[in-house]
Amino acid sequence: MSEFTLKTRLLAALEGKPVDKVPVCSVTQTGIVELMDKVGAAWPEAHTNPELMAKLAIANYELSGLEAVRLPYCLTVLGEAMGCEINMGTKNRQPSVTASPYPKNLDGAVVPADLLQRNRIPAVLEAIKIVREKVGPDVPIIGGMEGPVTLASDLISVKSFMKWSIKKTDLFEQALDISAEAAIAYANAMVEAGADVIAIADPVASPDLMSPETFKQFLQSRLQKFSAGVNSVTVLHICGKVNAILSDMADCGFEGLSVEEKIGTAAEGKKIIGDRARLVGNISSPFTLLPGPIDKIKAEAKVALEGGIDVLAPGCGIAPMTPLENVKALVAARDEYYA
């Protein structure tokens, strides 16, 4: 089966087809300070400048060996285009939402007709095109973005999101519907620009914040709508110990489910989802990849591979201060497993 390219291998793995070896990449954020310095493309400029955005994204493929190019580096691009106020962060801190446009009601809340021309969306789409031109057709590009649940909480504020989920469910559902619509439009624009996989991170959907009952009753249908509406392979990442919702996540229609080490072993995760979706992860970003040492990274990777992980990856966004050699160790672990 040596006819695989990086792209066909990743897509086959996510679709549950046989592959010669498990791909190793990151479906979550990949910008690390060491690479910013090496290639001269640093945050926060790389969040707005398409050339720098592309350069930094390509660096983690070229210099660490991750088998996909993933961009951008935050979960605020769509929120900003929908009216959220953003703090653009620093060289080692990601952008974050600082103010929500609709904390009291949804008067005037719609998906703007010019959504794809707003704020940083054109820069992301341009960066994807630059990446494709530079890496050629055989390297997969992963477009990352906030999921509809997290977007909804950004639009109305986390406080209102929690409150409305119990007391004003009509408004809660309206916020989710607007967010799903905007998310599908942005995702498909990334696909059109050249992304092969769309990976959404939806931390607000985690049982840490929303009950499994709320997930089942309100959130699952919007995630299903998203995966059905996007014209590519999709991956759903939800942070935290998601065991209580993992089976429901597997019914959301995403090819891949990206999980942290908090779920337990890959084998335990696979047991829950069966063949309904593929498991991506679950090497700890904060507790293993960031601090190392290398033998711990390799040992964790081996456990994941032996447990049947479908795509070996960091369990969450790579911490900006993670050393390059630690990311390389993740790739080496996969190579050694098949040696």
Curated annotation (Swiss-Prot):
The EC code for this enzyme is 2.1.1.246
**One example GO MF annotation:** [methyl-Co(III) methanol-specific corrinoid protein]:coenzyme M methyltransferase
Name what cofactor the protein needs. Answer: Zn(2+)
Q: Which Gene3D superfamilies match?
A: 3.20.20.210
Pfam families assigned: URO-D (PF01208)
Per its record, the protein catalyses: methyl-Co(III)-[methanol-specific corrinoid protein] + coenzyme M = Co(I)-[methanol-specific corrinoid protein] + methyl-coenzyme M + H(+)
List positions binding Zn(2+): H237, C239, C316
Matching NCBIfam families: mtaA_cmuA, MtaA_Meth, PRK06252.1
Consequence of changing C239A:
Strongly impaired methyltransferase activity
By sequence similarity, the record places it as follows: Belongs to the uroporphyrinogen decarboxylase family. MtbA/mtaA subfamily.
Per the entry, the cofactor note is: Zn(2+) is involved in coenzyme M activation: in the absence of coenzyme M, zinc is coordinated by a single sulfur ligand and three oxygen or nitrogen ligands. In the presence of coenzyme M, one oxygen/nitrogen-ligand is replaced by sulfur, probably due to ligation of the thiol group of coenzyme M.
Protein purpose: Methyltransferase involved in methanogenesis in the methanol pathway. Catalyzes the transfer of the methyl group from the methylated corrinoid protein MtaC to coenzyme M, forming the substrate for coenzyme-B sulfoethylthiotransferase. MtaC can be substituted by free cob(I)alamin in vitro.
Q: Which GO terms describe its biological process?
A: methanogenesis; methylation; one-carbon metabolic process; porphyrin-containing compound biosynthetic process
Q: Which UniProt keywords apply?
A: Metal-binding, Methanogenesis, Methyltransferase, Transferase, Zinc
Q: What CDD domains does the entry give?
A: Mta_CmuA_like
Lineage of producing organism: Archaea, Methanobacteriati, Methanobacteriota, Stenosarchaea group, Methanomicrobia
Which InterPro entries does this UniProt record tie to the protein? Methanogen_methyltrans (IPR052024), Mtase_MtaA_CmuA (IPR006360), UROD/MetE-like_sf (IPR038071), Uroporphyrinogen_deCOase (IPR000257)
Q: What is this protein called?
A: Methylcobamide:CoM methyltransferase MtaA
